[in-house]
């Protein structure tokens, strides 16, 4: 089974398509409000409930966390999912909103899951975020996404190779101070992009297009 973590950023019913009947759902704090648009029921609700009152619902497992703690509610949920033996976690409601620091924090949570052997995905209505660990090659078949961006998650990534994209990389270095990997696209005739890194983890962002654009242009 897969674990789905619902964080507090509001989501649209459009994301209901991502859920599976056997998903184990953990709602974090105000993230339980996302259950209604997604048409799902949480298995666990947890948080310090500083952004929403603690719900009173029958048959729900509710974990009340202290306000003073090292882990965010989403990080606590991620560790709980790992402890329960899930090998795949989808985070919804973890991107955007009025607290950009939580988006950055949730990226760190995603990488932490990967480091514990759990495949992590963060997704919203327009973008999907995944990770590539050192020594790993991941394939990204062409789906509804258009833009393909890769950034060094640990400040520097060496030996980065990317194939099937408009701007290919061969044993390249990506650094935090220069966004070389932003806004790539699938090469003409390509139905899959593969990317690998020898040293340093990557965060990969796939994004849908806004309007028809000219291939080969970077903003």
For the regions a protein language model found, what residue spans apply to each?
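General beta-strand structural signal in soluble alpha/beta enzymes
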Residues: 6, 26-29, 47, 64, ...
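Short phosphate-binding loop-to-helix
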Residues: 62-84
